[in-house]
Amino acid sequence: MDQQMSYFLPPITNTLPTGNCTLREVYRWITEDKSLETVTNELRAFIREGRVAEYRQLKQRQLPFVTPHGVFSRRKSDALISASGLVVVDIDHLASLEEAEQLRDHLFEDPYLGTRLAFVSPGGLGVKLFIPGDETVRWAMSYIQLLYCLLYTSPSPRDGATSR
């Protein structure tokens, strides 16, 4: 869990990193940061209430983000300083928070994926996985779709500087 990546303070329009962090630090933020928990609960309430536009605005204005692919001098693919060896798999449009939590747990334990970090997305209806690989790790999306019968697996972005 010592892979390095860039982190950015909100809003999402920031292109210059605030600093670098490890995967372990990202895990701690997700599991222990009370202010992030408060924002996440508010985001999930917006989703439950069908207030999608407000959800997007709050998410873009309030949540910090990282570039799991590595350390960047700015948020652009040609600004990669060092690769982390990680890519992101996004699974979206799940039916409920409970389904997302169950899928997160299954995928984290899957021996073939080698998942380093799995968490329920801020809206509560998706899962994000940080797995070993590079931009060519399309096999992971196919594997998850076949094994877990998912229809909504978003491929890892072509641009490694894409935020998560």
Which ranges hold each PLM region?
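Signature for HUH/AEP ssDNA processing cores
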Residues: 1-125, 132-148
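Ala/Thr-enriched low-complexity intrinsically disordered regions
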Residues: 161-162
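Conserved small/polar residues in nucleotide/adenosyl-binding loops
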Residues: 152-157
